[in-house]
Amino acid sequence: MSAAAAETDVSLRRRSNSLNGNHTNGVAIDGTLDNNNRRVGDTNTHMDISAKKTDNGYANGVGGGGWRSKASFTTWTARDIVYVVRYHWIPCMFAAGLLFFMGVEYTLQMIPARSEPFDLGFVVTRSLNRVLASSPDLNTVLAALNTVFVGMQTTYIVWTWLVEGRARATIAALFMFTCRGILGYSTQLPLPQDFLGSGVDFPVGNVSFFLFFSGHVAGSMIASLDMRRMQRLRLAMVFDILNVLQSIRLLGTRGHYTIDLAVGVGAGILFDSLAGKYEEMMSKRHLGTGFSLISKDSLVN
């Protein structure tokens, strides 16, 4: 490092944080003072140190840059650990789940290539499958009711755009069904044994369909999330209950694997979020008019 390199003192200070009541692991750079004697550029930090910054990086850095300091875990105390377990028990549960399923995964016997997939949802709904198999009329009625629910989802999602002028749910559904088509065609899962089809089920007419992932569940999630956004909480609760009943029926009729339904929930949340980001991005491009799928000129005319 050249002796003529310019050096700048950068001080890092310790600040309290609500995570553990003591400190955080971030880095704070104390900048200059503004007109009100407030520091500019402060962020949370863990320790009080001073480093030299030169033209080639930080003098205290390792490997051409970065900070040479104590590892974060070396400052942990028993009080910190108790705090995390007490107030952040959800991540702790997931950590325990990670360890548990690592043991399950590495000791579980793989399903033979010519065997039917194991599905825990099918095991739980075995009795429902037998009831529906022995009562075709009941199966038809439940399929018809499920189709009505799909119609309710579709109507609501289209309504939010055509009538209320809010396109987020519609965009999310377009994203979701396009992605579902790509994934469903890319990996075409075998139809489960004991599948109970119906001519009134959606898609109507006993036509073929993609198993992965469930568009029924994802569409319901998109509608429910929009309802919550608009404070239609009771309607959202009704949709969530119907979505659970729909999932039980789909497992009972072997219309979807459990993983199809679980990913359907995640897909609904994901594509609703992506649609929101799309709206935000387009709004920034059109700062004067905001986001709209329809030209503002057409609304005036």
UniProtKB/Swiss-Prot annotation:
It holds the Pfam family AtPDCT1_2. GO terms for molecular function: diacylglycerol cholinephosphotransferase activity. It is a multi-pass membrane protein. The keyword Signal does not apply. It catalyses: 1,2-ditetradecanoyl-sn-glycero-3-phosphocholine + 1,2-di-(9Z-octadecenoyl)-sn-glycerol = 1,2-ditetradecanoyl-sn-glycerol + 1,2-di-(9Z-octadecenoyl)-sn-glycero-3-phosphocholine. GO terms for biological process: phosphatidylcholine metabolic process. It is found in: Membrane. The active site is at residues 216, 256, 260. Keywords: Lipid metabolism, Membrane, Transferase, Transmembrane, Transmembrane helix. One of its GO terms (cellular component) is membrane. Residues 1-39 are annotated as: Disordered. Disruption phenotype: Reduction of 18:2 and 18:3 triacylglycerols (TAG) accumulation in seeds by 40 percent. Functions as a phosphatidylcholine:diacylglycerol cholinephosphotransferase that catalyzes the transfer of the phosphocholine headgroup from phosphatidylcholine (PC) to diacylglycerol, a major reaction for the transfer of 18:1 into phosphatidylcholine for desaturation and also for the reverse transfer of 18:2 and 18:3 into the triacylglycerols synthesis pathway. It is an enzyme of class 2 (transferase). InterPro entries: AtPDCT1_2_TM_dom, PDCT1/2-like. The lineage of its organism: Eukaryota, Viridiplantae, Streptophyta, Embryophyta, Tracheophyta. Optimum pH is 6.5-7 at 23 degrees Celsius. Belongs to the phosphatidylcholine:diacylglycerol cholinephosphotransferase family. The chain crosses the membrane at residues 88-108, 141-161, 171-191, 202-222, 255-275. Its EC number is 2.7.8.-. This is Phosphatidylcholine:diacylglycerol cholinephosphotransferase 1. It comes from the Eukaryota.
